[in-house]
C-alpha cells in the first residue's frame, strides 16, 4: 500500500477539494448559475446537480460497505444502467428545482460523504482500494473530484472566462 493517506489526511484532502469547488462556484456567482450552454446545454446548476447525483451514489455505496452489505440502491431507478440514461434522469429530476436547493443538496451530500468515510476505521479505509478495484491508485480527496476535474472543470472555467469578458 505504500504511501496511502491516513483517514485524517484523506478527509482533509477532500475538504480542500470541496473548498476549491466552493471557491469556483463563488467566483461564478449564483446570478450566473442557471444560464444554459456551459457544457452541452447544461447550466452550472445542472452540473452541480449531476455531480451531486453521482456523489449520492458513492455515499450509498460506502454506507453499504460500512454495514458489510453486498449491495446498495442507487439514487435513480434501478433499471437505468448506462451513464447517459442516468445523467438524463438526474438532469430531469433536478432541472426545475430552485438553485438554492441544488446548492444546499450538494453541500449536504458532501458532508454525508465525509461522515460516512470518517466512520470507517483506518484499516477499513485502506482496504477500500481493494474493494473498489483501485490497486494501483491511492484513495485520495482528488479521486472523489476526478470526474469534475476531467469532465466539467475545463468547460466551467472556459465559460467563466467568457462571462468575465462580457461583464
Description of each model-found segment:
Residues 2-5, 86-102, 132-141:
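Acidic/His metal-coordination segments adjacent to aromatic residues that form catalytic metal sites
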Residues 1-20:
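Extreme N-terminal tail/first-helix region
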Residues 14-16, 20-46:
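Long, hydrophobic N-terminal alpha-helical segment
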Residues 82-125:
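Acidic/histidine-rich alpha-helical segments that form the ligand environment
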Residues 34-85, 114, 122-167:
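Short, contiguous alpha-helical
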Residues 14, 18-21, 25, 55-58, ...:
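Hydrophobic alpha-helical core bundles mediating ligand binding, dimerization, or RNAP-core interactions
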Amino acid at each position: 500500500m505504500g504511501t496511502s493517506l491516513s483517514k485524517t489526511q484523506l478527509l482533509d484532502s477532500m475538504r480542500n477539494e470541496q473548498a476549491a469547488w466552493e471557491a469556483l462556484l463563488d467566483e461564478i456567482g449564483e446570478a450566473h448559475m442557471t444560464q444554459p450552454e456551459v457544457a452541452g446545454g447544461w447550466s452550472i446548476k445542472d452540473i452541480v446537480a449531476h455531480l451531486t447525483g453521482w456523489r449520492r451514489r458513492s455515499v450509498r455505496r460506502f454506507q453499504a460497505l460500512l454495514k458489510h452489505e453486498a449491495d446498495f440502491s442507487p439514487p435513480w431507478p434501478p433499471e437505468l444502467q448506462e451513464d447517459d440514461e442516468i445523467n438524463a434522469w438526474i438532469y430531469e429530476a433536478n432541472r426545475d428545482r430552485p438553485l438554492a436547493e441544488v446548492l444546499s443538496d450538494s453541500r449536504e451530500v458532501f458532508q454525508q460523504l465525509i461522515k460516512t468515510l470518517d466512520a470507517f476505521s483506518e484499516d477499513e479505509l485502506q482496504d477500500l482500494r481493494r474493494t473498489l478495484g483501485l490497486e494501483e491508485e491511492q484513495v485520495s480527496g482528488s479521486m472523489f473530484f476526478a470526474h469534475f476535474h476531467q469532465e466539467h472543470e475545463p468547460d466551467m472555467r472556459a465559460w467563466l472566462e467568457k462571462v468575465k469578458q462580457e461583464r
